[in-house]
Structures are given as C-alpha cells and as structure tokens.
Amino acid sequence: MNTALAQQIANEGGVEAWMIAQQHKSLLRFLTCGSVDDGKSTLIGRLLHDTRQIYEDQLSSLHNDSKRHGTQGEKLDLALLVDGLQAEREQGITIDVAYRYFSTEKRKFIIADTPGHEQYTRNMATGASTCELAILLIDARKGVLDQTRRHSFISTLLGIKHLVVAINKMDLVDYSEETFTRIREDYLTFAGQLPGNLDIRFVPLSALEGDNVASQSESMPWYSGPTLLEVLETVEIQRVVDAQPMRFPVQYVNRPNLDFRGYAGTLASGRVEVGQRVKVLPSGVESNVARIVTFDGDREEAFAGEAITLVLTDEIDISRGDLLLAADEALPAVQSASVDVVWMAEQPLSPGQSYDIKIAGKKTRARVDGIRYQVDINNLTQREVENLPLNGIGLVDLTFDEPLVLDRYQQNPVTGGLIFIDRLSNVTVGAGMVHEPVSQATAAPSEFSVFELELNALVRRHFPHWGARDLLGDK
C-alpha cells in the first residue's frame, strides 16, 4: 500500500471513515495539453510523485522502466507513469488519452493526459469534453506555438472556462523572469481571439525539477503566486448547468411490475422537486412529479448531475430520448441547427451525406446541408471548404429527420452535444456542439389529440416497417 495513503487512513480513523471523507470532497476534472514534448506526461508524473500517490511497486517498476525507456539520464522519467502504451514509451510521445486519479486533503482530481500531435486532435477533443479546467503547457524555450493556440481553441470550444498556462522547463532558461513575462504577454494577446469569458492564470514551473508544481520554488524568488497544485485545489468551478433551466433526458423506462412505472436518467441541468409540474417534449403532454426515486431511497428534490428515476402522477407515453422540463417553459422543437463539428473519420464530411446522430439518449438521423467554414485552428481564421477532413473543425448546417429539443452547447453540454454515427459500420465518426438551433418545427401539437399522438408514437416505435410519419415533425 502507498505509505501516504496508509497515513491518511490512519489519520481518519480507519478505512470506512476515510472513504466517507473522500465522498464529501469536491471533484475537479482537468486535462493537460500543449505542443509535442512540452512535458505534459512529466508534469502529471510529478504531481503524482510529489503528492505521494505512487505505490511502492509502481515506484520500483518506474526505476526499471526509466533505465530501459527513460529520456532523463540517471533521473526518474516521471512521464512513464502515464505513457502506458508500448508505442508511446518507445516513441516518447503520448498517443491515447490517459486518465489518472489522485487526491489531496482538499480535493479529488481526475486528470486527462491528452496527445499534443495534430493527427490526434480527435483524441484531445475527447479528453476535453468532460473537463472543467485545462492546463496548457508551454516550453519556455519555444514560447507560444501553433499547437498551443489549437489546444486553447478546442478547450474553449468544448466549454472549458478555466485555463492555467503552465510555462514549463524554466530550468532550461535559467528561471528567467523576462522570458516568463514575454510568453505571458504573447499568450494574452492571442487569448483575446478566444470566445467566452475566460479565467486565465499563469504559473512558471519545471516539471522535471518540481519547481512550483507542488511546492514553492527557491529558484524563482520573483514569482510570488500560488503553485500549480494550489491553483488546482482552490479554483472555484461554477457549473453552468446548475443555473440553467431543468432538463431531464429519459434514458430508460423502468417498469419492473404493474404497480411501478418510472423514467430513469441523469438530470442534465437545473433542479426538480416532488409536486413540480413538468412537460414532456416533443409531445407537449404535461403531468406532475409524484416521486423522485434514487439508489438511497426517495428524495424530495434532485439537482443537476444526479442519477434519478421520476414517477409521474399520470400514465402518459414517454420513451427513451424524450425530454422533461418545467411546464411553464416554452422551448420549441427544431429540425435544423448550426453545429460546431470535430470530424474523427478518414472519410471527409461532405454536404448531402446523412448520418445517425445521438443526443441526450435520443437517436435519429441528420443530413448535412452545408459547411459554412472550417476553422484553421493554428491561427483561428475561417476558410471556405468543400468538405471537412479528419481532425477538421468547422461550422456545419444540419437538418434532422424529426423535431429535436436542443440547447446551445455552451449552455447545456448534454442537450447541446451530439455524436455522428456511420449508418453502415456503426462507428462514431464525429462530435458536434450545437451552435444555434435555427428553425422551428411547424406542426402544432394542438392539431392532434393526445390519443392520436400516443397511437402514432406506438406505431412508429413497434412497427417501423410501416413507414408511419411523425405527426409532429413531418407536416
């Protein structure tokens, strides 16, 4: 067992007390990104090492691996802690997204170590999609590079508002304050082009030597700010979904017996309480929340991010992919949207193509009407293109086969994020972030009775070969 972990358990008074304490700590998900060989994996290894999160057998194995694959001479190569693939160790680069967990007395952390190479942009986007903070590493010898700009843009595109610019390898520039100041000014000039209201912080450090990572550096007396670990422990993450209106995508209809019918899913945003009047979209039927069922028993209210089962007072037609929201909220269904797309397939995305898409538990089809532009993510300029290639990022116009209830991705990642699925191979070929829902469905729910809508839904669900049209979306 890790000696530090054993000491923590002893201080808490046993394993059970330690586990309870862990549950009540806040969790921060962050990623490390930057140019090739800026020291991302070394930084994570240093964090794990200096916070005493490495087990004794791992440390022994690290000594052996450092002799075989290490790049730091006689020193421990801490990057090998996270470069787990054999190809990564042999090439000295990161290819896949590596996830690591560690905790301190103040907070729990999940780290995503993302690749820096341009051909692995899709891997980096995947890692960033679940994170709340990004550490952007910059080599003090090289300054701000194209890949630094690219990763900054992708991070902000995926909704990350907190950026920590870690200027690494300060030991190789004699811990120069002038170098740090110059790089800081260069990055701030570039950051003016990034979207959103960003929280940007700068930390000069040396991941190899441990300067300003978990402890203050004696080699940089001119820097009086917090260490990287102190920033991670104290940064306040304001979750956007907490302040957004209620959104509950139904993932599963739970009917274990004749006496129970519940709708299971994760509350995407807002809060819900017993007795609240809710509306089901796209049908528009309303009901009241009778119970909120959780693993720990019934609750009176639930909040964003919690997995719950809702029981309604009325038996109405609700299926996987439907969305529950407050009854007094007017949120129209749309059949078109402009979407920021990160393309992940060898075959380019072209106008006229159709794909299965999945959004908030609902699966339908979408047609690519056009590509407005592709972003040159090295300088953030926009250019017209005929198709979107592998690792390309651009703004695309989509038309859906049926009305969907969408939010902008920056407001709600669950109801604003989607994936593209190839209809033949069933492989995920792209990720999309709703930029703007652009047109309303024209059918009015009041033109059909509740019975007609439920019968139509029943036929389409159980007899798809009949080709019945959607009464709400095909008019």
Curated annotation (Swiss-Prot):
Gene3D superfamilies listed in its UniProt record: P-loop containing nucleotide triphosphate hydrolases, Translation factors
Top-level lineage group: Bacteria
Domain tr-type G: residue ranges: 25-239
GO MF annotations, alphabetized: ATP binding; GTP binding; GTPase activity; sulfate adenylyltransferase (ATP) activity
Chain residues that bind GTP: 34-41, 113-117, 168-171
Region (G2): 92-96
UniProt cross-references to CDD domains, sorted A to Z: CysN_ATPS, CysN_NodQ_II, CysN_NoDQ_III
SUPFAM superfamilies in alphabetical order: EF-Tu/eEF-1alpha/eIF2-gamma C-terminal domain, P-loop containing nucleoside triphosphate hydrolases, Translation proteins
One GO biological process term: hydrogen sulfide biosynthetic process
Protein EC: 2.7.7.4
Catalytically driven reaction(s): sulfate + ATP + H(+) = adenosine 5'-phosphosulfate + diphosphate
Span list, region G3: 113-116
Pathway listed: Sulfur metabolism; hydrogen sulfide biosynthesis; sulfite from sulfate: step 1/3
Region entry G4, spans: 168-171
Keywords, in A-Z order: ATP-binding, GTP-binding, Nucleotide-binding, Nucleotidyltransferase, Transferase
Keyword Disulfide bond: no
Hydrolase is among the record's keywords: no
Region (G5): 206-208
Region annotated G1, chain positions: 34-41
Family: Belongs to the TRAFAC class translation factor GTPase superfamily. Classic translation factor GTPase family. CysN/NodQ subfamily.
Reported function: With CysD forms the ATP sulfurylase (ATPS) that catalyzes the adenylation of sulfate producing adenosine 5'-phosphosulfate (APS) and diphosphate, the first enzymatic step in sulfur assimilation pathway. APS synthesis involves the formation of a high-energy phosphoric-sulfuric acid anhydride bond driven by GTP hydrolysis by CysN coupled to ATP hydrolysis by CysD.
Self-association and partners: Heterodimer composed of CysD, the smaller subunit, and CysN.
Name the UniProt record assigns to this protein: Sulfate adenylyltransferase subunit 1
Biological source species: Escherichia coli O9:H4 (strain HS)
